[in-house]
Amino acid sequence: MFRILSFLCSWILIAFAQPDMSWFFSLLGSAVGYGLLWYSLEPQKSPKLSWRQLTSLLFLWSVTVYGVHFSWMLSDLYVGKFIYVVWGVLISLLALLFTAFSCLLFFIVRKKHTKILWCLPGLWVAVEMVRFYFLCSGMSLDYLGWPITANAYGRQFGGFFGWAGESFILVATGISFYQVLLRKCFSRYVWLGCLLFPYILGGVHYEYLKNTFSKEENLRVAVIQPASSMLLEGPWSGSPAMAWQRLVSLSSIVRKPVDLLIFPEVSVPFGRDRKVYPYDDSQVILSPLTHFKHQDELLANVDWMQALSNHFNCPILMGLERWEELDSKLHLYNSAECISQHGELIGYDKRILVPGGEYIPGGKIGWSVCKKYFPEYALSCQRIPGARSGVIEVENLPKMGVSICYEETFGMLLRNYKREGAKLLVNLTNDGWYPSSRLPQVHFYHGILRNQELGMPCVRSCHTGITVAADALGRVIKMLPYETRYRKASPGVLQVSLPMQNYPTLYAFWGDFPMIFLSLLSIGCIGCYFGYRLLAKKEKA
């Protein structure tokens, strides 16, 4: 009976161990959830389950847990029914990885290979690194150690070892609690050490930084949240200039003076330079606020940006599409463009693209298969990853490290911004592809980790997601209402004086390299251990 209860309790604890769902389940699940699961299936008591039974139960447990974690993908209004196939393949693949890892753990426990038991956390980190950096564009969401970040101390631990350190310590905590349930010697002390280590280390660092935090240097930022996306809402009647109507109306709310005005990802259609807006129609919309400097017959989005920049006497940062001709071919980029009062235009092209939404995985073969069997999902024009640096430097502003969409969830990418001298992280996002889902919260709780990993403040500009400004300790300064299952996002302006204090972190210095080394060392130890035993067995024979 205890085994059945342990199995069910472990499912409940881990399924809801998501920082966006419950900080309580996140902290309790990371402490005892995996240990309860492993003990329920292999308590080293009779009756023992067969390997087939173990594998089946592990896969069932894992696939249903991951199904809950990625439930936001099932919002199919814009992405279509094919997303159910993608969701099923993704959670099955992740479940297979966890099932294989757990079976290896049970094999080691059954055969009493205790010398390599503590190599398993490093092995799991290696497994996650493969899917983190090499599965399509990288699957950075819902890594195993994410529940640790449900409080500020756990997030601050990421400033030492990043996401990989969090996953390592969570697996070590799970294994040690499993050993506690098996009544192994000293296991209780090991479990308490693994459990408390990230919170003590992160907590001491966090409290020290909080007590020495300075608010002397501030940046006056205004962020526009349209609460809609022209990209998703489709064509409208009337002049193309109507695309700017809501943005101009919201901009009129902004109070001067302001140092930087930010708009979200792909705020308006037609790209950066395409001249499609009739001057007369555009001037009618813009006239309550300001006017255009040049009276060209047709205007482009950069002309609107320049007019706003001149009016507010500050740079404008906006998400736009950008077309570029290379080798007689047109290439499409998802870009962030920044224009100054003096007309200086600096941009960044998104480097980590969303598979399926911005490109078809598998190259020409993948695109051909998609076009033949799923023609409605074959993208008419695929974006390509950019090469321009995401660090944007504009006169009278600190250097900004710009990311687009889920790029902000990759610590190694944004770590380069810190090394290039960026003082502020800016993310432009459109979470509207999955309306009335958990995605805005999931995305935010992954992205905000970069503040404490790198010791930098951040600003997020979203259409319907979480538009927020937070300091370098991850403390929210101001947040706008965002879309959930129960409410729609509200159009608005986030205007805030953001503390610009930065601080150095070990993760910014060494990134994932210590955990990569530890993972390779763990794999090497496991390989040498089994290799030595195999050779010894052959010699005896």
Swiss-Prot record:
Cited PROSITE patterns: CN_HYDROLASE
Keyword Nuclease: no
Keywords: Acyltransferase, Cell inner membrane, Cell membrane, Membrane, Transferase, Transmembrane, Transmembrane helix
Gene Ontology molecular function: any one: N-acyltransferase activity
EC code(s) of this entry: 2.3.1.269
UniProt xrefs under Gene3D superfamilies: Carbon-nitrogen hydrolase
An example Gene Ontology biological process: lipoprotein biosynthetic process
Protein localization: Cell inner membrane
Transmembrane feature ranges: 21-41, 54-74, 89-109, 116-136, 157-177, 189-209, 506-526
Pathway: Protein modification; lipoprotein biosynthesis (N-acyl transfer)
Annotated active site: E265, K350, C405
Membrane topology, from the record: Multi-pass membrane protein
GO cellular component: plasma membrane
Domain CN hydrolase: 219-500
Pfam families: CN_hydrolase, LNT_N
Function: Catalyzes the phospholipid dependent N-acylation of the N-terminal cysteine of apolipoprotein, the last step in lipoprotein maturation.
Protein family membership: Belongs to the CN hydrolase family. Apolipoprotein N-acyltransferase subfamily.
Entry protein name: Apolipoprotein N-acyltransferase
Source organism (scientific name): Chlamydia caviae (strain ATCC VR-813 / DSM 19441 / 03DC25 / GPIC)
